[in-house]
Design a protein with these regions (language model features):
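A short acidic, Gly/Pro-enriched loop at the edge of an enzyme's catalytic core
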Residues: 197-209
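C-terminal lobe and adjacent flexible extensions of AdoMet/dcAdoMet transferase-like proteins
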Residues: 302-308
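C-terminal alpha-helical "lid/dimerization" subdomain adjacent to the S-adenosyl-L-methionine
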Residues: 224, 241-285, 289-294
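Class I SAM-dependent methyltransferase SAM/SAH-binding core
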Residues: 140-198
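N-terminal auxiliary segments of SAM/dcSAM-dependent transferases
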Residues: 11-98
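A short glycine-rich, Lys/Arg-flanked "PGG" loop and its adjoining helix->strand segment in the class I
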Residues: 224-236
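Conserved alpha-helix/loop element of class I SAM-dependent methyltransferases that forms part
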Residues: 102-139
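A short SAM/SAH-binding and catalytic strip from SAM-dependent methyltransferases
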Residues: 207-221
Length: 308
């Protein structure tokens, strides 16, 4: 949605909503109300939000934290920004505890028939698309944004013979990912605490690098650095795939201005992402072929390849 496409009244409404949200007490009130509504919706769908958070918050996470945390990961300011209504963004236990239940609640509007399992359906669709891209399954896979392991475990199911590495910049998420892996009996090879633009992994060490809902949370400069880093990690014939918001989707093009403003208040780099020409940026980063295709009413899948 461009600024020019907004009607004057919608533009004014958006401006007023934005100004109201900039007032901290009003933002806190709006955030608390939105949170209550989200939890209520989740629990009506059978998603045990409060029960899950209560159970996870009682655990001693120090041993797993010590396993995944890596000293020296210097997080730039954009990684410490507020996201999704959490003041500490992705760098807090609350975000980690609530990640899976919140994902199912948010994506239930896309797959209402799936109810409490809507996020699984969303990820499964993306990974089925990936399977179609590989006549021969990739042997070495990197999940560039593991969070608590949801996309990593789906990659493991889609490509059971592959060696899979999960990476994330948030040690809170990775601690939960390691826990979830143990609960599921997962054979994920390693959990890596690193920035996606500075992984520290070897050149050409993966046949497939995948990222799920990462780039709408990144400034443009960071996205460009990530693209270059991924290109470094891929050998000839390697593939980079990601799923993210589709700016051309009718869901965003027709979204009421005040709703879009509310959404952007929890996604500080969404405008930056919507302004990127992904195809041109990937070609500039050294990829040879780029395919972009819608895969849900709100998302697209991007496949970028390196020639053999």
């Amino acid at each position: 949605m461009t600024q020019a496409s907004l009607a004057p009244q919608a533009d004014l409404t958006s401006l007023l909503v934005g100004k109201a949200l900039a007032v901290k007490p009003l933002w806190a009130l709006a955030k608390a109300q939105a949170r209550r509504m989200m939890i209520g919706r989740a629990e009506r769908l059978g998603i045990p939000w409060r029960e899950t958070v209560a159970e996870l918050s009682q655990r001693d996470w120090q041993p797993l934290w010590d396993q995944v945390f890596r000293e020296g990961v210097d997080l730039p300011a954009n990684y410490r920004a507020s996201f999704h209504g959490y003041d500490a963004g992705h760098l807090c236990w609350e975000a980690a505890y609530e990640f899976e239940v919140a994902s199912n609640a948010v994506h239930s509007s896309l797959y209402p028939e799936a109810g409490a399992h809507s996020d699984q359906v969303l990820r499964q669709g993306y990974h089925e698309l990936l399977q179609q891209q590989f006549p021969q399954a990739p042997a070495r896979i990197l999940d560039l944004h593991s969070t608590v392991g949801l996309s990593t475990f789906r990659l493991e199911q889609a490509f059971p013979s592959a060696t899979i590495t999960g990476l994330d910049f948030s040690p809170y998420y990775l601690t939960l990912a390691a826990y979830n892996a143990a609960q599921k009996g997962s054979a994920v090879d390693a959990w890596v605490h690193a920035l996606p633009e500075a992984t520290g992994l070897a050149d050409g060490s993966f046949d497939l690098v995948s990222a799920f809902l990462l780039f709408h949370e990144m400034p443009q400069g960071t996205t460009r650095r990530i693209f270059r880093e991924v290109r470094r990690l891929l050998p000839p014939g390697g593939c980079f795939a990601f799923m993210d918001m589709n700016p051309a989707s009718g869901a965003y093009q027709t979204m009421p201005a005040f709703v879009m403003t509310l959404l952007k208040s929890t996604e500080p780099f969404m405008d930056a992402y919507f302004g990127l020409d992904l195809r041109q940026e990937l070609l500039a980063a050294g990829f040879d072929e780029v395919q972009i295709q819608p895969c849900t009413p709100r998302h697209h899948a991007v496949i970028a390849r390196v020639r053999v």
